[in-house]
């Protein structure tokens, strides 16, 4: 590690930002609520992003922060719909659009001696349109369904560096819980994910899943759970490819997927029961 010699470095930065926000909501009945919000936000670069130290993890790459990074400023408009139905059906859906100026991104380029340099920069303007949904439903006395999902499109524009990139991203995470007699519970979870990539980069999706069994003893005081995470896969493969004018790089990570666990918990004493009422307009 070494720090470039530069006596003119100035690490002081003073800024003022106007951050307005507004919201409105409508409750047509006791099952539906609509929220419309507008907000602004500031995201400042982290110490790691600003750190000018140069790191040489190997003979082909260099990693360095950028002390000249500016904070990114975002505007967001979102419409949220909350629905409460029979059998404890709960649905929350949001549609949003955001615009971000001076968006901070990690990127890479080919430097001297054909070394790939990884750093951070303010990459023009980012546009994002997305839909997210959260569902929870007691379909029967013995069955509970839940799911989280999102899908969106992300666009990066920076004319000075010739960047005009559009990418889709998505996620879907369902779960099933079976409530069986004699205080047995069985369940399964899954997940499919693809994140929005860095500039000039394409990401591959990843998936994971798990199963569990739970049994309560001693009037619910003792709980025993057995969990199996991705039992049929040894690794989760994560891959991304960056294409530059002079070089193309592919990074592949193999994350340990398969694992098993046993959890024991015991509750001492019994507290007083309290009736809790939920304000469904929140």
Residue ranges of model-derived segments:
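Signature of Gram-negative outer-membrane beta-barrel scaffolds
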Residues: 1-29
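Residues on the lipid-exposed face of transmembrane beta-strands in outer-membrane beta-barrel proteins
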Residues: 22-26, 77-83, 131-137, 151, ...
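Repeated loop/turn-to-beta-strand initiation elements of outer-membrane beta-barrel proteins
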Residues: 26, 31-34, 87-91, 141-145, ...
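C-terminal beta-signal and adjacent terminal beta-strands/loops
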Residues: 217-282
